[in-house]
Regions:
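Beta-lactam-recognizing serine transpeptidase/beta-lactamase-like catalytic domain environment
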Residues: 6, 12-64, 69-171
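Short loop/turn motifs at secondary-structure junctions and domain boundaries
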Residues: 1-4
Length: 171
């Protein structure tokens, strides 16, 4: 990550065992054990990049990492197939005027079928917006619940319960 803020979580792919947590920027914990000057402490404490923040314990919007989840829900509910395509062009789309000025945008137009495979390859926001509408609210929420969203999980550190909405409902 060089000079950027971020975090990594490394887990065993078969067991889910937590192998490593890294938050950057970081600090040298030995400085605390060996004692540090007030100047050093202030430089860590006052750093706008927050090196003492455990970023892996914070809540973040999932962004494009949620696209495979959406695809999996579509496939397991039989709302989507790998062959289903949507028809649209350009980099901006909205369902209808009920969305007001809100548009779904995707970064890069691409040629080829607007299907699940290409949508994952090109991280196509428009495809996944349309797919979610096709899946439907009830199927989508039930699919998330089957994946344990909204449940507390056993974890060696205290973490927030996963959520798919800031309220009790999605529109």
């Amino acid at each position: 990550l060089k000079d950027n803020e971020g975090f990594f979580v490394v887990m065993h792919p078969k067991t889910g065992e937590l192998l490593a947590l890294v938050s950057t920027p970081s600090y040298n914990p030995n400085d605390f054990a060996l004692g540090m000057s007030t100047e050093k402490w202030n430089s860590i404490k006052d750093d706008v990049r927050k090196p003492m923040l455990a970023r892996y314990l914070q809540s973040y919007c999932p962004g494009s990492t949620f696209k495979p989840v959406t695809g999996a829900i579509g496939l397991t509910t039989n709302s989507l197939s790998t062959e289903d395509t949507f028809t649209y062009s350009g980099t901006s789309w909205k369902k209808d005027n009920s969305w007001g000025d809100y548009n779904i945008t995707t970064l890069t137009p691409y040629s080829g079928a607007k299907n699940l495979r290409n949508a994952l390859i090109h991280s196509d926001n428009i495809y996944f917006a349309q797919a979610t509408l096709k899946i439907g609210k009830e199927n989508f929420i039930n699919g998330l619940k089957k994946m344990k969203f909204g449940e507390n999980i056993e974890f060696p550190l205290t973490v927030s319960k996963s959520q798919y909405s800031n309220g009790d409902d999605i529109s």
